Amino acid sequence: CKVVDFAASRKTAALAEQLIDETLGDPGVVEVGSDDAGRWTIGLREVPRDGSDTGLALNSDSVFVVTGAAGSIVSAIVADLAAASGATFHLLDLAAKPAANDPDIALFVSDRDALKRNIFERIKAGGERATPAMVDRELASIERAEAALSAIQAIERAGGNAHYHSVDLTNSDAVTTVMSEILANHDRIDVLVHAAGVEISHMLADKPREQFDLVFDVKSSAWHSIMRAIGDKPLGAAVVFSSVAGRFGNGGQTDYSAANDFLTKCVMSFSNARPETRGLAIDWTAWGGIGMATRGSIPTMMAAAGIDMLPPQVGIPVVRRELTEGPIATEIVVGGRLGVLTAEWDEAGGLDVGAIDMGDEHGPMLGRVVGMSLAKGLTVETELDPEAQAFLYDHRIDGTPVLPGVMGLEAFAELATLLLPEHHVESIDNAQFLAPFKFYRNEPRKLRVTAQFAGVD
């Protein structure tokens, strides 16, 4: 499957031809954009933070609106934002506003096993047969109440103002009412953090329609309701919580993946539709220590898939840093090793390498194409023989043939031209000569050269 995005002005005939080309080739790419400047796709690259403070100034005058505030991860992030700003926070969640003196919350913090026993006995006392699933549901409700209370208390400790709104985010009228109340008291919203989400994993064929709608609407309908309510009022930044499931897809999470990707595309549109608002989508990997992914067999499954769980101390400051240190990109992936999510499904990147005719019009440094992928780029392999190539036979160190540095540069130039035949090489910059490539005993050696596209923001 592929998604192909064309400019609205593209003529139908050319569009049809390109769609056919996309169907027949380049199976390693699933998202493609096409305009007059060329063909574009999306890849991953690591971008270090520079620690600058060119982003938003968060202070006691700042106004935050946060959805999904009763989630343990969101609660921890709110606490971090509050400590850095002392701002005003409007917290939205389906969970009822927690009472500071709730004994269940206190017991959840001090002795979770004792709380489970209490819940079990309460269910029995009500005349029902207590099951582990019933206990876990009640415990999850108390856990969300504790997370909401923790967020409120963290804001208050930082000298900020916490306003908690219990609201069904899939109810457009209810969300509009809450947002109208918020906007009646403030002339702007500095930061919207849309972090609400529900994840119910089932294969699409086995998933009831109402379940799909719930998972999708918590993110999408809530977003529409909130943005309609904000209208043309100032909004400094909108941060949406997406997932690696939204970026890469995941089995049994079609609805969750689609909803997350929808939010990402919404904030990406801000560059044209709302340029005064900074949009940021964070594709989180699974968190370790807190959150939904810590339960049951999920950590074991993640390890088997080669996916690192995100340590809370690494993940919690991300939102604050992205807001205050200025934009690097509209969409970022936060995680460690991503395992199967970024694995190459075809060793050659979908190319029929045996059918590629390199022709005779190339230099001595290109042999045969080995493969092509987003992660590794275009790779060629060539065999060099000191007995056949004079530039090796005549270039020796202590009698051993050594690949001349200039021929290494020639390999780069030849491969770049193969990758982009409509361009020419103008210069080679930042070359480093780290170690000699030697041909011991005058024997042939195989050389692999890889070319990757430079990232474009």
Which role does the model predict for each range below?
Residues 73, 77-81, 215, 226, ...:
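Structural preference for long, well-ordered alpha-helical segments in enzyme cores
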Residues 15-27, 309-457:
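Acyl-thioester-processing domains in fatty-acid/polyketide/NRPS systems
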Residues 88, 272-279, 417-425:
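Phosphate-handling active-site elements
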Residues 258-259:
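Active-site helix of classical SDR
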